[in-house]
């Protein structure tokens, strides 16, 4: 752990991997490298991304994932990106990682109808609590004979066993 000076912008770089063992070796190397930020996303088998973030004073362009554009999609679309430091820290919140699809607000029309102010984890949490009380999705599922249960689980896996866990999972 180290403290580093904050700058106005963050340069983001995304690297794609197809092999889990190479991906986790790359993750370990980046963590050991002293990068300002390291992030990893597994979209599915053979579709792994490592993201590095580096504080910079200037940005040749800025992306905005606070309303119409969706951050997690940009990972596959761009090898490099720039955000303000504030937007970098909150990059996952607009779409509650990728859970916004469960509310239909990845649809551009519904996204505009919801409005920028409602696209955040606070709103999604309120909707989830409301749904839990009213059991709306359970009732719809029962009506159509569909049962769906959401499970979100964080696990701590030693990096040297991570590829093995991913194969199991």
Where are the regions a protein language model picked out?
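Noncatalytic alpha-helical scaffold of FAD-dependent oxidoreductases
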Residues: 1-169
């Amino acid at each position: 752990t180290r403290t580093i000076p904050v700058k106005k912008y963050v340069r983001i770089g995304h690297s794609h991997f197809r092999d889990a063992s190479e991906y986790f070796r790359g993750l370990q190397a980046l963590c050991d490298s002293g990068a300002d930020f390291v992030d990893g996303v597994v979209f599915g088998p053979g579709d792994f991304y490592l993201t590095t973030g580096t504080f910079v004073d200037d940005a040749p362009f800025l992306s905005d994932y606070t309303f119409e554009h969706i951050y997690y999609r940009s990972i596959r679309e761009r090898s490099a990106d720039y955000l303000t430091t504030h937007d970098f820290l909150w990059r996952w919140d607009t779409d509650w990682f990728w859970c916004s699809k469960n509310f239909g607000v990845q649809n551009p029309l519904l996204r505009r109808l919801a409005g920028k102010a409602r696209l955040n984890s606070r709103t999604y949490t309120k909707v989830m609590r409301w749904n839990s009380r009213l059991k709306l999705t359970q009732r719809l599922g029962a009506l159509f004979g569909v049962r769906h249960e959401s499970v979100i689980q964080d696990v701590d896996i030693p990096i040297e066993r991570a590829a093995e866990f991913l194969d199991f999972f």
